[in-house]
């Protein structure tokens, strides 16, 4: 079964939103295509209740996520340009094989 990877960054979500719809739009589209080719199932940027940046991904396995994330220098550049200065907090969840999944 797949995993959900939730990564939280100490940076305002609004900063990244401006970047991914502006000067880094082509970069995120290229990253999306590479992620799909590497097995990504879902990917969204989100804003938590404190206005901080979150990324929620679904991958076939944690190893597949780590292999992709660790080989994409464009990701590090993107988060740096969004004002991220410290390491993210990542939590992984195993997605249950439940009959009501959408």
List where the protein language model places each region:
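Short S/T/G/P-rich N-terminal loop/turn motif that feeds into the first structured element of a domain
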Residues: 1-73, 84-102
């Amino acid at each position: 079964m797949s995993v959900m990877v939730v990564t939280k960054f100490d940076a305002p979500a609004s900063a990244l939103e401006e970047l991914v719809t502006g000067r880094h739009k082509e970069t995120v589209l290229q990253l999306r295509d590479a992620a799909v080719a590497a097995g990504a199932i879902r990917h969204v940027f989100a804003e938590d209740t404190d206005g901080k940046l979150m990324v929620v991904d679904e991958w076939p396995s944690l190893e597949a996520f780590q292999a992709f994330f660790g080989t994409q220098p464009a990701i590090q550049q993107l988060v740096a340009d969004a004002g991220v200065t410290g390491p993210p907090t990542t939590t992984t969840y195993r997605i249950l094989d439940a009959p009501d999944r959408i």
